[in-house]
Structure formats: C-alpha cells, structure tokens
Amino acid sequence: MTQQFTNELFCDYYERWIEVYKQDAVRSVTMGKYRMTHKWLVRLVPTLQLKDIDRIAYQRLLNAYAAEHERQTVMDFHHQVKGAILDAVDDGLIPRDPTRKAVIKGK
C-alpha cells in the first residue's frame, strides 16, 4: 500500500491530506488558504510524485512560488505544505524531511 501512495502525485496527496486533516478542523478562511495552496501546487509541480520530493525539488517549488509572492506569503505557503510533508514522513511515505533548511525567499 505504501508503494501506491509514494507513486501518487504530490498535489493529489496534498488535496487528500487537506480533506482528512483540515476539513471541519479549521475556519473557512484558513481552508480557503489551504485550497489556494493546492491550486499553486497543481500549477507549479503538476507531475511531481510524492516519492520524488527531496530538498532540491522542494526548494525549487519554493523558489518558483517566491518569484510571484512576498516573503511572508511564501512563509505561509511553506508552513502549509510542510505540514503535509511531515505527515508523509511520519507515515513512511517519504524517507526524510525535504523541508529541513529550506530557504524562504520572496519579492
């Protein structure tokens, strides 16, 4: 079963993670932010598989997002995505935390 999930697209995993862990647990405004983060993942890394997320892939994602956003917005995006990634690490879907030592940039 783990193999199935590691081959899963990261944007699909993130969407499922929102539904499982955030739906009905956060305010609607916050949920809107999680959904917007999902839309950006679909736009920036539509083919990235969960198993392929490493520090370089994650930093490239942040850099692409930072090209169009202020630093604080990039920090918020990072925190939302990091939550899903840390759960994937805890669940054994990816071997280590690729968000460690991420550099937060912005316009």
Write out the residue ranges for each language-model feature.
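Substrate-binding beta-hairpin/strand module that engages nucleic acids
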Residues: 102
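Ca2+-coordinating acidic residues in Ca2+-binding motifs
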Residues: 57, 98, 106
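N-terminal core-binding DNA-recognition domain of tyrosine site-specific recombinases/integrases
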Residues: 2-11, 18-93
